[in-house]
Amino acid sequence: MPYKILLLGASYGSLLASKLLYGGHHIHLVCLPEEAKLINTEGFKVRLPIRGRAEPVLLDSQRLPGSVSAGPAEGVDVKQFDLVGLCMQEPQYRSPGVRELMKAIGESGLPCMSIMNMPPLPYMKRFPGLDYKSLEAAYTDARVWDAFDPNKVTLNSPDPQAIRPPGEPANVLQVTLPTNFKCATFVDEKYNQILRQLETDVANARFDTPEGKIELPVKLKVHESLFVPLAKWAMLLAGNYRCVTTDGMRNTQDAVHADIEQSRS
């Protein structure tokens, strides 16, 4: 059964959309006017590297089974959709228009699946025993998340990496690390059925080449554990996020080993 899926953010969101379109779903991307105009006219294109092939394959949304549209945050009727994907960087959700859309999404009770680097605050509230109020300072504007039910928010590990190639149109994305999205389940099994259908659709996707159909990387893997999408955070907290100091930059190895006991903690 095709779903109607609302994705906030067309940059990283195009990668997720390119995989979901294989299931015949309709994707609506919330993005900037210039991006929306290009996507509505030409679709979007994702260059995806394949192991064993010298050149990446090109996923053209106009040639995929589903359909895609794009537009601004204003005027979106959230009641039309079955699932929301949160694909923007965390500070962008406080932007005018996006903030109001987020409130409407939260109040609608729609299930939300995040591929943000920063775990949404409602997702963190699914972990018992955390001091949620103390976490609010880590967010640009924690009030953006007030309308969301934690049980209806889940998270993907943002493992796949992609860039907008310099000098290319705004509807082109280049995947640089084609790893999998690892998604935690929702509390409600009704919404998990959507996730598992999408997981199957992405797994079954094949790309036509002169040598025949090939399997594509960047899967959607559904996991029962809330902790799976946070697997990279130990590395980030012990290494990457401690590379910038008041005295300047240092490499990840030095960040970890400068105080090994703190890193272990």
Where are the regions a protein language model picked out?
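Active-site-adjacent beta-strand anchor residues
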Residues: 29-30, 87, 246
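NAD(P)+-binding Rossmann beta1-loop-alpha1 motif at the extreme N-terminus of oxidoreductases
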Residues: 1-52, 121
